[in-house]
């Protein structure tokens, strides 16, 4: 039927007279081979020499420009060279010609796989249609242009008979038998070692307590989002001049517990080789202490107020880009710290470390947009621009989505509330899976049992109580002030809590985060349905949500972008709020309720200057309570310590 359809098409094109003999089919086969080569080169040359331009012209996601396009370009050049003998003389190289047809079929299968597994699957549909068309045209022309004995089934049967006969002759030789067994043994050993070093799935560590599981268990990120464990251990010493100050990962605000080799929020996972990956606790475990000389108290599910996530990312990216970041240098550092076996060293040297470097360089390009925005600083991240540009492949729209990292405790009463700062979703599982996807989880990699255990623990895990003494008289004075000025929007059980009720023009807070979550992103979420990921509850809003305030004392700095350092500052008119202040300290200010931002204590424990004059950092709006007297403000703050 396909052959008849092609003949009909040729007839309609006025070429039916040329279809009278097989030579004509072969000539057209060779012409289409050269057409295919030309089309390959039209794609391959810019892919090799101008990948960024190609992505913008074709509409591919920008993160595919490197190294994906360069690799694709080299592959297409190789395939084009492979096609050339058939383009010159297909009858002479008939088996080779059928292999050319087969490559198109392999490409069709590859595109179908990408379309069904990749988040950007739709962009590969034109490639699928192109290769499918060439497969059908080339296959039909070659079939019509060859004799029956040169068609696939006959060639396969002849080849099988010849192979069996040759095998029987060779098998008579004792040396051939020994050589065959040696080759099979070597191949088997290489295959086993490759499986053992690269693919073997080691069961995840079981944690007795839900809290330890939250802090140290993997949730299932994709391979490019995981860092080889040995590399993670030595990376701080690879480029010490690029570190903010001497030390290990703690200089980026990572929190450690005694006896643990990994910081809280970094999970060890082994698929072949050991890796580490971030989990929920990295961004949602905070700390506090009374003075810079005290030992910090770690609080799982609190905002990670000291974590400098962007600085950590770019240290890894810039270090991987450094000329001295070579496999030899990395392996020397690893060997000085760990005792690896012979084959473990071999696979790390020639596969694992080069793969990790390639992944870091790819991420560096994918996250280059971060350099065009104000620095995030401690305790903050851009929530949805990574999803927009890195996951879904949207072009950079210059929006700023930087927010203060939120707490994640006490999720049960929040299950149906519209949260994510702008109230864009009221489904806890969707919110959690979307956060995981933004840092590298995929439908194939995510571990639902581990994820569900974390989610279930957070449902009932309560906010920490105020750890210091309270002035009960002030608490009593502050309660009615809270009821009159704050409770309607921020108390559990109220109709407006967890809802978007006040337009951004009236609320007056910085609109950049709101603008960064677009209707296009909502549409992308709604169409992305690959179990267990399903994001049908996302919506676009026109302001920020009224969030519950349990544990508000440990959620400083305040407002969605962390632009107001303390509750006392939040109750001041915007013109009296600090313009520039230090963030990243976990030394607590129990009077003003927040972390210290000035003075020796702040400078001893942090060094990032938050500038509210920068776009996305504005400290305007939320004027509620600013009209109160200072005495009433102090009473209100004392009561809010009890929430």
Task: Tell me the role of every PLM-derived stretch.
Residues 83-95, 115:
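Juxtamembrane helix-break-helix junctions at the cytosolic face
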Residues 38-46, 64-88, 101-105:
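Core segments of alpha-helical transmembrane spans in multipass integral membrane proteins
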Residues 97-111:
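Hydrophobic alpha-helical membrane segments
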Residues 26-33, 39-67:
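Membrane-helix boundary elements
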Residues 109-126:
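Membrane-helix boundary connector in multi-pass membrane proteins
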Residues 132-154:
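Membrane-water interface at the C-terminal end of transmembrane alpha helices
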């Amino acid at each position: 039927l396909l052959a008849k359809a092609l003949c009909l098409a040729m007839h309609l094109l006025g070429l039916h007279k040329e279809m009278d003999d097989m030579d004509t089919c072969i000539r057209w086969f060779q012409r289409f081979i050269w057409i295919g080569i030309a089309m390959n080169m039209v794609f391959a040359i810019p892919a090799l020499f101008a990948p960024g331009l190609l992505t913008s012209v074709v509409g591919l996601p920008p993160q595919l420009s490197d190294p994906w396009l360069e690799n694709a370009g080299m592959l297409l050049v190789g395939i084009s060279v492979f096609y050339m003998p058939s383009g010159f003389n297909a009858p002479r190289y008939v088996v080779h010609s059928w292999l050319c047809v087969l490559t198109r079929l392999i490409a069709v299968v590859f595109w179908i796989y990408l379309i069904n597994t990749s988040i950007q699957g739709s962009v590969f549909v034109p490639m699928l249609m192109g290769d499918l068309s060439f497969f059908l045209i080339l296959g039909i022309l070659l079939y019509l242009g060859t004799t029956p004995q040169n068609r696939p089934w006959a060639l396969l049967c002849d080849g099988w008979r010849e192979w069996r006969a040759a095998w029987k002759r060779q098998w008579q030789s004792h040396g051939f038998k020994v050589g065959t067994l040696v080759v099979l043994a070597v191949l088997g050993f290489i295959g086993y070692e490759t499986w053992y070093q690269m693919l073997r799935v080691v069961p995840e560590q079981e944690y007795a307590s839900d809290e330890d599981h939250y802090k140290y268990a993997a949730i299932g990120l994709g391979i490019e989002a995981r860092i080889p464990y040995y590399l993670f251990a030595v990376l701080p010493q690879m480029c010490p001049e690029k570190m903010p100050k001497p030390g290990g990962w703690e200089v980026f605000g990572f929190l450690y517990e005694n006896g643990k080799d990994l910081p809280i929020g970094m999970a060890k996972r082994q698929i072949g080789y050991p890796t580490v990956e971030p989990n929920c606790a990295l961004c949602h475990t905070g700390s506090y202490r009374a003075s810079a000389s005290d030992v910090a108290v770690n609080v799982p599910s609190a905002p990670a107020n000291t974590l400098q996530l962007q600085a950590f990312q770019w240290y890894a990216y810039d270090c991987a880009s450094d000329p001295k970041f070579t496999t030899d240098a990395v392996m020397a550092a690893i060997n000085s710290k760990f005792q690896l076996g012979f084959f473990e060293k071999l696979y790390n040297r020639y596969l694992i470390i080069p793969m990790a470097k390639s992944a870091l360089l790819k991420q560096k390009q994918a996250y280059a947009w971060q350099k065009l925005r104000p620095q995030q600083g401690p305790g903050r991240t851009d929530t949805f621009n990574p999803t927009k540009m890195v996951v879904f492949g949207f072009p950079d729209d210059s929006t700023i989505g930087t927010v203060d990292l939120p707490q994640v405790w006490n999720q049960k009463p929040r299950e149906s509330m519209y949260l994510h700062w702008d109230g864009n979703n009221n489904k806890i599982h969707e919110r959690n899976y979307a956060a995981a996807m933004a840092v590298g989880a995929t439908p194939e990699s995510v571990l639902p049992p581990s994820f569900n255990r974390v989610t279930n623990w957070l449902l009932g895990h309560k906010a920490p109580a105020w750890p210091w003494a309270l002035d009960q008289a002030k608490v009593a004075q502050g309660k009615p002030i809270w009821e009159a000025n704050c409770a309607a929007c921020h108390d559990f059980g109220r109709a407006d809590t967890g809802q978007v009720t006040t337009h951004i023009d009236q609320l007056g807070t910085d609109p950049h985060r709101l603008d960064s979550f677009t209707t296009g992103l909502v549409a992308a979420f709604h169409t992305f349905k690959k179990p267990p990921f399903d994001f049908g509850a996302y919506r676009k809003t026109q302001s920020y949500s009224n969030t519950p305030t349990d544990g508000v004392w440990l959620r400083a700095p305040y407002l969605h972008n962390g632009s107001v350092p303390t509750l006392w500052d939040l109750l001041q008119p915007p013109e009296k709020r600090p313009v520039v202040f230090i963030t990243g300290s976990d030394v607590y200010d129990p009077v003003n309720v927040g972390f210290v931002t000035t003075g020796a204590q702040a400078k001893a424990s942090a060094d990032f200057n938050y500038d509210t004059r920068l776009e996305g950092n504005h400290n305007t709006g939320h004027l509620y309570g600013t009209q109160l007297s200072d005495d009433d403000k102090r009473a209100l703050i004392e009561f809010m310590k009890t929430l």
